[in-house]
UniProtKB/Swiss-Prot annotation:
GO terms (BP aspect): prolyl-tRNA aminoacylation
Major subcellular site: cytoplasm
Domain remarks: Consists of three domains: the N-terminal catalytic domain, the anticodon-binding domain and the C-terminal extension.
Organism: Bacteroides fragilis (strain ATCC 25285 / DSM 2151 / CCUG 4856 / JCM 11019 / LMG 10263 / NCTC 9343 / Onslow / VPI 2553 / EN-2)
Name used for this protein in its record: Proline--tRNA ligase
EC number(s) per entry: 6.1.1.15
């Protein structure tokens, strides 16, 4: 294990390689036989399950229900909404045949040319079209509204440059699709779900985010507005961590979804969609982890506490086992997930390094002297600090420590992010500062042409027009740093994943 840890590239040497090493060595995920598709390993999936469980609870608390819609979408459905199909056309995987057959030369199976589909099917890149075709059958009257549906699913988008969790051809996500009687209700829903995502990111992931609206050039294909939460990684790059879209009546018109309103008049339905994906795993890893491995927030750690015994003989181990049994029971009563690793096939030092690599928030160690003194050694993963504490009331001590760790890693990430937010007024200064990374607040004239020029010349994009103020005067009008034309307010630029 010492060698494996040594092989973990340091962030300062190659941040990208550090991330790749960590995902594999911490047993989170690995590449598969299919290019661009990943295998999420049990430990990585356990983290995703905790994310999924918490988000699902938050969705249900806001009145949403889960449903499931088909993986395969008729090609004609994508043609109904012009902007939408243009946004996804190059990424779509297409099913053209419904059957294979044995090759005549015995070399294996081949596509049966006689089994060509009358209409090709698209493996869902997102589900707006298939869902709105379904909603047409569900909605006739204002009494049928609102519909607040969420789907947990996989989606597929061909990606040329893939990275585990951050950008893969197939990924897991949730997608909410809601239908409303009024524009106001739909807009409120889009903001409500953005706030749910922000609360989840900050309270559970301990990842500080900026809430804002995307520029027209960056918004979701087919949306009137796209709201986003943007996080900053340790290399100063932005990661879009969740989006919520106000779709207006575009999809209702495309699929002729109308309802009779309270005035007994026909009207098109208003819509939203919103989603987060396994990209959140990448955000979690890159925001908190260090050169020793993962640093997981206790709220999402599959194992919050690990206990490791150090013993000289089997008799001593039995005494430690008996002592630890009660501690484990009391920790579990407090809802803390705990693992007692008394397996004899690995040395304590190996276990320490392994659990450190996997980001377990708290490690408890009991040896022979601890047994005599009724103490345990406690190590917290976020700071690597150690302390010897009494076993009396240790469950309460650990419970408080987990909350302290959760708060500390959020504070650390927030302090770092805030220190990397810069304000610039000239394009020359912008080009200099963007090389250093971080978020840059600058004036922009609101045109696609200027936005594209900045992107082409610096690889920086407008992450969002933020809702909150970061520096005095950033919400006041000014002059575009590139053209000198009027600008309504400063926007956030950054290079991104």
């Amino acid at each position: 294990m010492a060698k494996e840890l040594k092989d973990l590239t340091k962030r300062s040497e190659n941040y990208s390689q550090w991330y790749n090493d960590l995902v594999v060595k911490a047993d989170l995920a690995e590449q598969s036989a299919v290019r661009g598709c990943m295998v999420i390993k049990p430990y990585g999936y356990a983290i995703w399950e905790k994310m999924q469980r918490q988000l699902d609870d938050m969705f249900k608390e806001t009145g949403h229900v889960n449903a499931y819609f088909p993986l395969l979408i008729p090609k004609s459905f994508l043609s109904r909404e012009a902007e939408h199909v243009e946004g996804f056309a190059k990424e779509c995987a297409v099913v053209t045949h419904y059957r294979l057959k044995n090759a005549e030369d015995g070399s294996g199976v081949v596509v049966d040319p006689a089994a060509k589909l009358e209409e090709e099917l698209i493996i869902r890149p997102t589900s707006e079209t298939i869902i709105w075709n379904t909603y047409k059958n569900w909605i006739q009257s204002y009494r049928d509204l609102p519909i607040l549906c969420n789907q947990w699913a996989n989606v597929f988008r061909w990606e040329m440059r893939t990275r585990l969790f951050l950008r893969t051809a197939e990924f897991l996500w949730q997608e909410g699709h809601t239908a409303h009687a009024t524009r106001e209700e739909a807009e409120e829903e889009a903001i409500r779900m953005l706030n749910v995502y922000a609360e989840f990111a900050e309270k559970y992931m301990a990842v500080p985010v900026v809430k804002g609206v995307k520029s027209a050039n960056e918004r979701f294909a087919g949306a009137l507005d796209t709201y986003t939460i943007e996080a900053m990684m340790q290399d100063g790059k932005a990661l879009q961590s969740g989006t919520s879209h106000f779709l207006g009546q575009n999809f209702a018109k495309a699929f002729d979804v109308q309802f009779v309103n309270k005035e007994n008049k026909l009207e098109y339905v208003w819509a939203t969609s919103w989603g987060v994906s396994t990209r959140l795993m990448g955000a979690l890893i890159m925001t908190h982890s260090d050169d020793n491995g993962l640093v997981l927030p206790p709220h999402l750690a599959p194992i919050q506490v690990v206990i490791v015994p150090i013993y000289k003989n089997d008799e001593q181990l039995k005494l430690i086992d008996a002592k630890v049994e009660g501690i484990v029971a009391r920790l579990k009563q407090l809802g803390i997930s705990v693992k007692y690793d008394n397996a004899d096939n690995k040395r304590p030092g190996f276990k320490f390094a392994d659990y450190e690599l996997k980001g377990v928030p708290v490690r408890l160690v009991m040896g022979g002297r601890d047994l005599e003194n009724n103490t345990m050694e406690v190590m917290r993963r976020d700071t690597l600090e150690k302390e010897t504490v009494t076993c009396d009331g240790i469950e309460t001590y650990v419970q408080n420590l987990l909350e302290e760790i959760q708060a500390n890693i959020y504070k650390k990430a927030r302090t770092y992010r805030d220190s990397r937010i810069t304000t610039v007024d000239s394009y020359d200064e912008f080009k200099e500062k963007i090389e250093e990374g971080g978020f840059i607040l600058a004036h922009w004239d609101g045109t696609v042409e200027t936005e594209e020029k900045i992107k082409e010349e610096t690889k920086a994009t407008i992450r969002c027009i933020p809702f909150e103020s970061f520096v005095e005067g950033d919400k006041e009008p000014g002059k575009c740093m590139v053209t000198g034309k009027p600008s309504a307010c400063r926007v956030i630029f950054a290079r991104s994943y």
